[in-house]
Amino acid sequence: MRIIGIETSCDETGIAIYDDEKGLLSHKLYSQVKLHADYGGVVPELASRDHVKKTIPLIKAAMAEANVTPQDLDGVAFTAGPGLVGALLVGATIGRSLAYAWDVPAVPVHHMEGHLLAPMLEENPPPFPFVALLVSGGHTMLVEVKNIGEYRILGESIDDAAGEAFDKTAKLMGLDYPGGPLLAKLAEKGTPGRFKFPRPMTDRPGLDMSFSGLKTFTANTIAANGDDEQTRADIAYAFQEAVCDTLVIKCKRALEETGLKRVVIAGGVSANKQLRADLEKLAKKIGGEVYYPRTEFCTDNGAMIAYAGMQRLKNGDVCELGLQARPRWPIDQLTSIQK
């Protein structure tokens, strides 16, 4: 079976074609970073308009690279949510239209399920069950994963997502958009131990998280110490260390609560080198394993949507004609899009 995946939930247009026997046949991605850079963040209307321009050409390019025709496809998967409603509607409209024209099922995919399953595209995929740490610009959550579609949310951020905190803190420090990766790079030049940031909500039981207070702490630290280059690097180091420590502490608790030994980390922040290293240390300490996707599949992409869509298609999770998008869609309520 073959399926095409369409990702348009935010500011990346991603298209991929996946074969359940041969694996990934093609993968195309267009990033809108330059489009939004002058605004310091994603402008939803601009994002939607750009998806309209880029999606069809990328679909043609992906099909040409994979050497497939519409007759070779068994389904069209698209991100149905969560995300920016206008951006989602572009992908949903195109996806459902193509499914109708090609007489194949339309398969709505949950964006975070796509991230969660992205490591399955690797040569050494994680076996079920495992604990997933999903860390992106819009979501940060810990999920117990028993199998595909069997998810239990263990904890999540009650305010800013980790990726959002990285980007907002980077903006406070005068870094360009998107600031998260730039802050991480600046942190590599930082001096360990000069500044000590709090580890929010780690002094109490539970698996929920909070990162918004770290922005205020960063602003106060800058105000008290200046913003010369080395000080900025030291602050970046302390901020990143606080976020990573918090995530690792919560991961450890989640593993203890579930009795599991395997951790999957996915989403844009899963590309962070420090977070990966810290989770590797945790896994080694407890005799566990940590899995994550290759860097290009950490951020939004069509490959993860195509893979997740294939699993949904095999399970019969397809939708009738009619347009639906879910800007807000809990990952433990996946069946609601078909109803």
Curated annotation (Swiss-Prot):
EC number: 2.3.1.234
BP terms from Gene Ontology: tRNA threonylcarbamoyladenosine modification
Pfam family of the protein (one): TsaD
Domain of life: Bacteria
GO cellular component terms attached to this protein's record: cytoplasm
Biological source species: Vibrio cholerae serotype O1 (strain ATCC 39541 / Classical Ogawa 395 / O395)
Enzyme class: transferase
Entry-linked PANTHER family: TRNA N6-ADENOSINE THREONYLCARBAMOYLTRANSFERASE, TRNA N6-ADENOSINE THREONYLCARBAMOYLTRANSFERASE, MITOCHONDRIAL
Protein name as annotated: tRNA N6-adenosine threonylcarbamoyltransferase
Residues engaged in binding Fe cation: H111, H115, D300
Family indicated by similarity: Belongs to the KAE1 / TsaD family.
CDD domains: ASKHA_NBD_TsaD_bac
Catalytic reaction(s) noted: L-threonylcarbamoyladenylate + adenosine(37) in tRNA = N(6)-L-threonylcarbamoyladenosine(37) in tRNA + AMP + H(+)
Physiological role: Required for the formation of a threonylcarbamoyl group on adenosine at position 37 (t(6)A37) in tRNAs that read codons beginning with adenine. Is involved in the transfer of the threonylcarbamoyl moiety of threonylcarbamoyl-AMP (TC-AMP) to the N6 group of A37, together with TsaE and TsaB. TsaD likely plays a direct catalytic role in this reaction.
Keywords: Acyltransferase, Cytoplasm, Iron, Metal-binding, Transferase, tRNA processing
Binding site for substrate: L134, V135, S136, G137, G138, D167, G180, N272
NCBIfam families per record: gcp_kae1 (TIGR00329), T6A_TsaD_YgjD (TIGR03723)
Gene3D superfamilies in the cross-refs: 3.30.420.40
Molecular-function GO terms, alphabetical: iron ion binding; N(6)-L-threonylcarbamoyladenine synthase activity
